[in-house]
Amino acid sequence: MRLRNNANAPLYLKSQEQYIVNDQQLLKNDLAKVFKNPHLPLHIEIGMGKGDFIVENALHNPQINYLGIEKFPTVIVKAHKKALKHKLDNLAMICFDANAILDLLNSKSIDKIYLNFSDPWPKKRHAKKRLTNPYFLEKFAALLKDDGLIEFKTDNESLFHYTIYDVLLNDLTKYEILFLTYNLYALVNNVELLKNIPTEYEKKFVMQGQRIKKVSFRFLKKND
């Protein structure tokens, strides 16, 4: 079910100081005003939804800073209210469109990017809007440190096939796949499942018996 638009969401976000980044320049120029320990590794989730994944990650991994990026104010309000139930020094959220992500973060500043259940944009003419399209991956590559990773999870068979075969395996000089599964929850006792933190969509899809696909990959450097 699509979340009903909250017309007051933008004003709510502007009034919040805990967890919400209202001055985007801080992420490039003064991380000490965003995180208590600004020198920790930084992981970002693009399209964080209602926040289940990123809040739980921040709770379980205090040695990592987490930034959730979500372009819909109504949705980020839900995530923010979940975060307020906890006292976290390593979590921040911002309402922002990933199309302009290079304006938000410094190059070579991110250790890991999470893409969870992104919009599949099924029509061919919309392929450039997919977050695993080379258009976006080039932006993400600029943000990631040399050993940085991308983790992508989806229930969508077509989007996963596109990501693997049309993008990652289509240019082996650019990408290296580190982990790949078409059925994450079938990997009993596998570390990838044991450490998995589900999103709100993921929980629903698993209950419906849908297979969760996952791939982790990195960008190859010229000397690799």
Swiss-Prot record:
It comes from Ureaplasma urealyticum serovar 10 (strain ATCC 33699 / Western). PROSITE patterns: SAM_MT_TRMB. This is tRNA (guanine-N(7)-)-methyltransferase. It comes from the Bacteria. The active site is at 119. It catalyses: guanosine(46) in tRNA + S-adenosyl-L-methionine = N(7)-methylguanosine(46) in tRNA + S-adenosyl-L-homocysteine. GO terms for cellular component: tRNA methyltransferase complex. GO terms for molecular function: tRNA (guanine(46)-N7)-methyltransferase activity. InterPro entries: SAM-dependent_MTases_sf, tRNA_(Gua-N-7)_MeTrfase_Trmb, tRNA_methyltr_TrmB_bact. PANTHER family: 3-DEOXY-D-MANNO-OCTULOSONIC-ACID TRANSFERASE/TRNA GUANINE-N 7 - -METHYLTRANSFERASE, PENTACOTRIPEPTIDE-REPEAT REGION OF PRORP DOMAIN-CONTAINING PROTEIN. S-adenosyl-L-methionine binds at residues 45, 70, 97, 119. Substrate binds at residues 123, 155, 199-202. Pathway: tRNA modification; N(7)-methylguanine-tRNA biosynthesis. Pfam families: Methyltransf_4 (PF02390). Belongs to the class I-like SAM-binding methyltransferase superfamily. TrmB family. Keywords: Methyltransferase, S-adenosyl-L-methionine, Transferase, tRNA processing. Its EC number is 2.1.1.33. It is an enzyme of class 2 (transferase). Catalyzes the formation of N(7)-methylguanine at position 46 (m7G46) in tRNA.
